[in-house]
């Protein structure tokens, strides 16, 4: 039974479909199937699957339910995990086992169709996640089997793709290409250090000439600090040199 060709499996390619076309370069394989034709083929395979399962269920006898693909004890234990469940009949785990088997088969077929779309012969986790996202009845599994995020290419953290020209910013934008150039939230961005203008020595002011206006000197100190800290503010003349100690 396991080695038989199932009626809903993919049909082999017709003879001569992969024959090379003379005079057409690169036409050695079969032509690409349009997207709407591919969807029709997938829908036909799913319909054939359920038609075959219906026929198997109608032809099933009592002896067929003695052999199970899934352990009934495990299914019964899961059913008893619900506090509202008191008693379980002998037929209930059998029906649950068959329902779980159909669920696994349909999800596998839908995942395999996604793998074939991507020209792969290996079923991957992303195929299962894509099949869940495409099917409305499987939406309860979206959070359980999330789709894998695209892996970062080498050099994407520096703002350019691997193999690209130096200094070329990635097309994903600054948020995706330059994640390390932004400080964490709540911390100020690094700035260029401003020139520090030290306060005048009180001894200079005490020994200054009596004709020097102290208020003007204080206002000059404030204007000078603002001009230096602003990087390009109005230029101010330097104050007179301190008096000589001689």
Curated annotation (Swiss-Prot):
Primary localization class, coarse: nucleus
* Cellular component, GO, one term: nucleus
Q: Low complexity compositional bias: what residue ranges? A: 9-21
Q: Which UniProt keywords apply?
A: Cytoplasm, DNA-binding, Flowering, Nucleus, Transcription, Transcription regulation
The keyword Nucleus appears for this protein: yes
- Cell location: Nucleus; Cytoplasm
What is this protein's expression induced by?
A: Circadian-regulation under long day (LD) conditions. Expression increases at the end of the dark period, peaks in the beginning of the light period and gradually decreases during daytime.
Pfam families, alphabetized: Histone
A GO MF annotation of the entry reads:
DNA binding
InterPro entries assigned: Histone-fold, Histone_H2A/H2B/H3, Transcr_DNA_Rep_Reg
Gene3D superfamilies in alphabetical order: Histone, subunit A (1.10.20.10)
Task: Give start-end of the signal peptide.
Answer: none
A GO BP term here is: flower development
Instruction: Tell me which family the UniProt entry assigns to this protein.
Output: Belongs to the NFYC/HAP5 subunit family.
In terms of PANTHER family, this protein maps to: HISTONE-LIKE TRANSCRIPTION FACTOR CCAAT-RELATED (PTHR10252), NUCLEAR TRANSCRIPTION FACTOR Y SUBUNIT C-6 (PTHR10252:SF39)
Q: In UniProt terms, what function does this protein have?
A: Probable transcription factor involved in the regulation of flowering time under long day (LD) conditions. Functions as a repressor of flowering, independently of HD1 and GHD7. Controls flowering time by negatively regulating the expression of EHD1 and HD3A. Component of the NF-Y/HAP transcription factor complex.
How does this polypeptide assemble, per the annotation? Heterotrimeric transcription factor composed of three components, NF-YA, NF-YB and NF-YC. NF-YB and NF-YC must interact and dimerize for NF-YA association and DNA binding. Interacts with NFYB8, NFYB10 and HD5/NFYB11.
Q: What is this protein called?
A: Nuclear transcription factor Y subunit C-2
